[in-house]
């Protein structure tokens, strides 16, 4: 029997919760287990990008839900979800208890986004070579990397040769050892007009790139242990 871990949509009502929970272990015929009781007052379901990251060594999953400052671990053998890491952003992370609700929700949320009052979202959650990666959005716009050997978090705002992609979700996947990054042709062309390229694979691409080009390029970033 094959089981699947399913995300509900994260709301306080039946439209976006599974029997009042965020996650369920199901075979799509019946619910076997429920995880993470719902909290907050969110009424509209959402589907965050990259909510899961695979733990290649243990064949488990890391889970980073939206509006929750905790990364969880799903143990496939035990069929259970456990808190794995609490992320302390010193009050700057917009959790469900700080999220605006009610008649003025749209206006308040718009102000949070435009004035960058909080870290209001995260993207690009992946695992590669024993490290977790994700990108913050809002009050902080940097990338974060967590070394799973010692749980130390590092932040950075450039990927290679001081390149910063404009995409809000640049890490589109991982094979466990490499991160896959999607960038636009004109991004690379413009970036390297005045900066020396130190990567041979990118050097070979540059002559064919145009500052006006709209093609997308898939890059592989090898993450060392």
Please state what every model-predicted region is.
Residues 62-70, 118-122, 126-141, 146-151, ...:
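Exposed, low-structure sequence patches enriched in small/polar residues
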Residues 16-19, 27, 57, 65-67, ...:
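Short loop/turn segments that connect beta-strands within the blades of beta-propeller domains
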Residues 10-16, 68-70, 139-140, 186-188:
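Short glycine/acidic-enriched loop and turn motifs that connect beta-strands
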Residues 18-29, 69, 142-151, 208-223:
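Beta-propeller blade signature
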Residues 1, 9, 46-65, 102-103, ...:
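Structural signature of eukaryotic scaffold interfaces centered on beta-propeller domains
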Residues 175-225:
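Blade-level signature of beta-propeller repeat domains, shared across WD40, Kelch, NHL, RCC1
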Residues 81-119, 148-176, 188-190:
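Conserved blade-ending motifs and adjacent loop-strand segments that build the rim/top face
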Residues 20-78:
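Loop-centered beta-sheet repeat module
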